Curated annotation (Swiss-Prot):
Function: Mono-ADP-ribosylates eukaryotic muscle and non-muscle actin on 'Arg-177'. ADP-ribosylates all actins tested, has more activity on nonmuscle beta/gamma-actin than on muscle alpha-actin. Prefers monomeric G-actin but can weakly ADP-ribosylate F-actin. ADP-ribosylation prevents the polymerization of G-actin to F-actin, causing actin filament depolymerization, destruction of the cytoskeleton and cytotoxicity. Does not possess NAD(+)-glycohydrolase activity, unlike most mART enzymes.
Regulation of its activity: Inhibited by novobiocin.
Taxonomic placement: Bacteria, Pseudomonadati, Pseudomonadota, Gammaproteobacteria, Enterobacterales
Protein encoded by which gene: spvB
EC number of this enzyme: 2.4.2.31
Family membership noted in the UniProt record: Belongs to the SpvB family.
Disulfide bonds: none
Recorded GO MF terms: NAD+-protein-arginine ADP-ribosyltransferase activity; nucleotide binding; nucleotidyltransferase activity; toxin activity
Pfam families per UniProt: ADPrib_exo_Tox, SpvB
Coiled-coil regions, chain positions: none
Binding site residues for NAD(+): 414, 471-477, 538
Protein name (Swiss-Prot/TrEMBL): Mono(ADP-ribosyl)transferase SpvB
Length: 591
C-alpha cells in the first residue's frame, strides 16, 4: 500500500481531484511504479514558436534539490555515468545523453573518420584546434548527431548536439555551465545546455549561477567545505530581436544581444512579498536554505545551499511598454522549511495587468487531505469527515472570476478587444451557454447573466469597515490627460465600467498610486475566502463604480513628500519610492 505524506492510497482514492486552472498542469494518480506525480507550468511567454520547454514536475520518488523534495526543473544536460562507480575522468568513463541513454562512440570509417580535428565551424574560426569525437545513443530513438569537443590548447570541453529538426544545442561551452571538481577543473562531471539556435536564427540562452557562500554560516558543518561546484539555473533569455545563424557563444562568453523575453529564477535576491512586484535586477544576496545537503556521486562534493523562491517572466519592449523590463507573470513558491527536510507547500501564479496592477494570485497546489483514521489499536484521534459545502451559482461565478475570468470580463465591459473564443468557452463551461456557436444575441444575453451573477455574488459578501484602499497604476503612457482608458470621465467624476480591484492592505509601488477614500455604505467587498486563493486581501468593486478626483499631487510638488509618508506602502517598497510620479486622491461615491 502506497503511503504518501502519511496518507494511505485507500484514503487518497476517496479524494476528488481538485480543479486546477488552465496552463499545462497535469495531476496523475499512481501508475504501475507506485509513484505519484504532478507538473506545474512555468510562466513562459510564447514567442515565434521557439521558447524554452521548461516545467516544474514532481515525483514522489524524486530526491531533494533547489525546489525541495521531489520537485525539479532540469535543463538539457550530458553527464558522466555513475551507476557503475565514481568516474575516473579518462577514456574509460561512459556518458549519459540528454535522454538518460548511455552514449557510445560512433564507428570510424574511411569516409567519416572519428575523431577529427576542427579549426572552425561554418564561417566561424577558432583561436585553437579541437578534437571532435562523435557519439550516439546505445539505443537509437532520437536520431541526433552528438559531438564531444576538447580544446587542444586549454583542454576546455563541451558538447554540440545537432537535433533531427535542425536545431543546434551547445552544452557546457563555458565554465559557468559545467559541474567540475573545484580542485581539478578538467574533471567535468556534467555539461548543461547553454545555448540553442534554430535554422531560422532564433536563439535561447541559459545563464547559471555558481555557489559563492553568501549568507551561509561558515562555522560548524560548513567549515572547510568547497562549495563552488554547484550550478543554479538563473536566467533563460530568448526572442533575439535580430536573427543570427551562428551560435553567439562561438565568439563571446556572454552574448551582448537584445532579448525580448527573460525567464528569471530567483533564489531570494529580489524579495518574495506577493504585494510587491520584484525588480528585474537582483537587489540582495541570495538566501541560504535551512536543510543544506551534498552529493558525492561524481567523486567531489556538490553542495546545495539554495532554494528557488520564485520564477519571473519579464518582457523587454521599451518603446511599446514604456520601460525596459516589464514583469508580466510570476510563480511564487512557498516552502515548509526546517533543518531536516524542505518541502514545497504552495505555489501562487500572479499575473500583472497592462497598467501594472497585480491580479489576485492563483493557488496551484492541491490542499492537503484530511488526516486518515489511525489503523488498529485504541486511538484518541477522531475519524476525519468530509464537509459538503454547497455554494450558490453567484458565488461560484465570483470565485471563477477571481481565478481567471477577470481578464475577459473586464475587457468586455470596457469595450476593449477581448478573446471572443475564450469568452465563449468560459460561458459554455459555466453553463451560461448551451452551444459553442451562439448567435450574437445569445452571447450578449449569456454575458449579461454571467456578469450579473458575479455582481450578485459580490454584493452577498459582508460589508467592511475599511475606509481607505489603494490601487497602483501606470499613467505615464498614455498621458495623464487621458486619466485611464478604461474609465469614462465626467468633469472630475470617473466611472469604472468594469469590476475594480483594489487593496485595503498595502500600496505597492507604481508610477501612480490611487489613494481611494471610502464612505459608509460603499459597495466594495473583501473577497477573502471566496477568492480563488483563500484569504487574499483584495477589495473588489462592482461595475460602474463612481469615483471623484479630489486632488492630484505630482512628484516635486510641495505636498508630495508629506502625502507619500501617509501611504501604507508595502514592506519592501521603501527603496523604490522614486518610481512614484503622482498620488491621485479619490473618493468612492455611493450614488
Amino acid at each position: 500500500m502506497l503511503i504518501l505524506n502519511g496518507f494511505s492510497s485507500a484514503t487518497l482514492a476517496l479524494i476528488t481531484p481538485p480543479f486546477l486552472p488552465k496552463g499545462g498542469k497535469a495531476l496523475s494518480q499512481s501508475g504501475p511504479d507506485g509513484l505519484a506525480s504532478i507538473t506545474l507550468p512555468l510562466p513562459i511567454s510564447a514567442e515565434r514558436g521557439f521558447a524554452p520547454a521548461l516545467a516544474l514536475p514532481y515525483s514522489s520518488g524524486g530526491g531533494n534539490g533547489p525546489f525541495g523534495v521531489g520537485w525539479s526543473c532540469a535543463t538539457m544536460s550530458i553527464a558522466r555515468r555513475t551507476s557503475h562507480g565514481v568516474p575516473q575522468y579518462n577514456d574509460s568513463d561512459e556518458f549519459l545523453g540528454p535522454d538518460g541513454e548511455v552514449l557510445v562512440q560512433t564507428l570510424s570509417t574511411g569516409d567519416a573518420p572519428n575523431p577529427v580535428t576542427c579549426f572552425a565551424y561554418g564561417d566561424v574560426s577558432f583561436p585553437q584546434s579541437y578534437t571532435v569525437t562523435r557519439y550516439q545513443p546505445r539505443t537509437e530513438s532520437s536520431f541526433y548527431r552528438l559531438e564531444y569537443w576538447v580544446g587542444n590548447s586549454n583542454g576546455d570541453d563541451f558538447w554540440l548536439l545537432h537535433d533531427s529538426n535542425g536545431i543546434l544545442h551547445l552544452l557546457g561551452k563555458t565554465a559557468a555551465a559545467r559541474l567540475s571538481d573545484p580542485q581539478a577543473a578538467s574533471h567535468t562531471a556534467q555539461w548543461l545546455v547553454e545555448e540553442s539556435v534554430t535554422p531560422a536564427g532564433e536563439h535561447i540562452y541559459y545563464s547559471y549561477l555558481a555557489e559563492n557562500g553568501d549568507n551561509v554560516d561558515l562555522n560548524g558543518n560548513e567549515a572547510g567545505r568547497d562549495r563552488s561546484a554547484m550550478r543554479y539555473l538563473s536566467k533563460v533569455q530568448y526572442g533575439n530581436a535580430t536573427p543570427a545563424a551562428d551560435l553567439y557563444l562561438w565568439t563571446s562568453a556572454t552574448p551582448a544581444v537584445q532579448w525580448l523575453f527573460t525567464l528569471v529564477f530567483d533564489y531570494g535576491e529580489r524579495g518574495v512579498d506577493p504585494q510587491v512586484p520584484p525588480a528585474f535586477t537582483a537587489q540582495n544576496s541570495w538566501l541560504a536554505r535551512q536543510d543544506p545537503f551534498s552529493l558525492y556521486n561524481y567523486g567531489f562534493e556538490i553542495r546545495l545551499l539554495r532554494l528557488c523562491r520564485q520564477v519571473l517572466m519579464f518582457h523587454h519592449f521599451p518603446d511599446e511598454l514604456g520601460e525596459a523590463d516589464t514583469l508580466v507573470s510570476r510563480l511564487l513558491l512557498e516552502y515548509d522549511e526546517n533543518p531536516i527536510r524542505t518541502q514545497l507547500c504552495a505555489a501562487r501564479t500572479l499575473a500583472y495587468e497592462g497598467d501594472g496592477y497585480r491580479r489576485a494570485p492563483v493557488n496551484n497546489m492541491m490542499p492537503p487531505p484530511p488526516p486518515p483514521p489511525m489503523m488498529g489499536g485504541n486511538s484518541s484521534r477522531p475519524k476525519s469527515k468530509w464537509a459538503i459545502v454547497e455554494e450558490s451559482k453567484q458565488i461560484q461565478a465570483l470565485r471563477y472570476y477571481s481565478a481567471q475570468g477577470y481578464s475577459v470580463i473586464n475587457k468586455y465591459l470596457r469595450g476593449d478587444d477581448y478573446p471572443e473564443t475564450q469568452a465563449k468557452e468560459t460561458l459554455l463551461s459555466r453553463d451560461y451557454l448551451s452551444t459553442n456557436e451562439p448567435s450574437d444575441e445569445e452571447f450578449k444575453n449569456a454575458m449579461s447573466v454571467y456578469i450579473n451573477d458575479i455582481a450578485e455574488g459580490l454584493s452577498s459578501l459582508p460589508e467592511t469597515d475599511h475606509r481607505v484602499v489603494y490601487r497602483g497604476l501606470k499613467l505615464d503612457k498614455p498621458a495623464l490627460s487621458d486619466v485611464l482608458k478604461e474609465y469614462t470621465t465626467i468633469v472630475n467624476i470617473i466611472i469604472d465600467k468594469a469590476f475594480m480591484s483594489t487593496s485595503p492592505d498595502k500600496a505597492w509601488i507604481n508610477d501612480t498610486i490611487l489613494n481611494i477614500y471610502l464612505e459608509k455604505g460603499h459597495k466594495g467587498r473583501i473577497l477573502g475566502d471566496v477568492a480563488h486563493f483563500k484569504g487574499e486581501a483584495e477589495m473588489l468593486f462592482p461595475p460602474n463604480t463612481k469615483l471623484k478626483i479630489e486632488s492630484i499631487v505630482n512628484c516635486g510638488s510641495q505636498d508630495f513628500a508629506s502625502q507619500l509618508s501617509k501611504l501604507r506602502l508595502s514592506d519592501d517598497a521603501t527603496a523604490d519610492t522614486n518610481r512614484i510620479k503622482r498620488i491621485i486622491n479619490m473618493r468612492v461615491l455611493n450614488s
